Swiss-Prot record:
GO BP, one annotated term: queuosine biosynthetic process
Residues given in the record as substrate binding sites: 56-58, 75-76
The protein, known as: NADPH-dependent 7-cyano-7-deazaguanine reductase
Source taxonomy: Bacteria, Pseudomonadati, Pseudomonadota, Acidithiobacillia, Acidithiobacillales
GO CC terms, sorted: cytoplasm
EC main group: oxidoreductase
Pathway(s) it belongs to: tRNA modification; tRNA-queuosine biosynthesis
């Protein structure tokens, strides 16, 4: 039976809650609709998080992202919604979500969200996170 889009995110217990470690996910195939024109908008999300007690289950994340393909939303609203839903689900020690929205009308948009649990800090591991590289539009590309 084929999978269907679903807003139901699932989680599982962190197998090593005693340790800070980074989970990196590359999510290159996100699609939703422009709320003004109804035209498709495409984004590449890059997610980094340091789990506390839970991790997000990958198939549910895929189906969750797929569920937005026919929904209209501004880039900033959609990126924040996804971050809020993930934070609400797994309450990570740290989360960073970069939404890299593809060129529309000659403009690229990057939306970066960062969240930390109150009082949590680990500068050593945060220094190991991949550097955010802002999109650079080049004519003809």
């Amino acid at each position: 039976m084929p999978s269907q889009p679903s807003r139901e995110l699932e989680r599982f217990s962190n197998p090593h809650p005693e340790r800070d470690y980074v989970v990196h996910m590359d999510l290159p195939e996100f699609t939703c609709l422009c709320p003004l024109t109804g035209q498709p908008d495409f984004a590449h999300f890059m997610l980094d998080f340091i789990p506390d007690q839970h991790n997000v289950e990958l198939k549910s994340l895929k189906l969750y992202l797929w569920s937005f393909r026919d929904e209209g939303a501004f880039h900033e609203a959609m990126t924040n919604r996804i971050a809020d839903d993930l934070i609400g689900l797994i309450n990570p020690r740290y989360l960073r979500l970069l939404g890299r929205w593809y060129v529309r009308g000659g403009i690229t948009t990057d939306v970066l969200i960062e969240h930390r649990q109150p009082g949590w800090q680990n500068p050593d591991i945060l220094g190991q996170l991949p550097t955010v590289r802002w999109a650079q539009h080049q004519p003809g590309h």
